[in-house]
Amino acid sequence: HGDEHGDEHDEYANLIHADYVQEDAEFRGYEFEIGRTFSLGSGDLTLSFGRDDVNAEFSDGHNVPRINPSRNIYSLSYVENDWKFKLSLKDVEKQDDIGEGESVTDSYQMLNTRLTKTFNLNGAGELKVSIFGSNLLDEVARNHSSFVKKQVPLAGRNYGAKFSYKF
């Protein structure tokens, strides 16, 4: 539109104005998960460990922004008949390989659990009822790739119930 709006478009109401442009970059990383299942009682116990890590630099040597930090994920699950229990710990490392305009994101540990009972409704479908707890350590955790990580942390300790019906 015309020039009658003058400089008002130069003001961004304290928001960051960024122009993202393509640059040559090199990404290096890996992701793996190992696990083992054991018979225990009349059910199965599964233990697993996973890790992922990504490093990314532009060809001039500065860091690509919004790259998630390395994570270690420990998991334990037990399944017996119509019951399933799962406990997981996500250990997210500090991200200090930051790009232009970013800030360091602290490490955190996220402990989650879930207990699910499945009801077979004799040809009328299947009902799963779960109770869960998330962020049981009540960590202040921030998503490094979020543009609003300073203002909006991840959810604190919370509990809930979930009902799922398949027909």
Positions of predicted regions on the chain:
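Gram-negative outer-membrane beta-barrel transporters
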Residues: 3-96
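C-terminal beta-signal and adjacent terminal beta-strands/loops
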Residues: 94-96, 117-167
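Short, surface-exposed loop/helix-turn segments at secondary-structure junctions
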Residues: 99-104
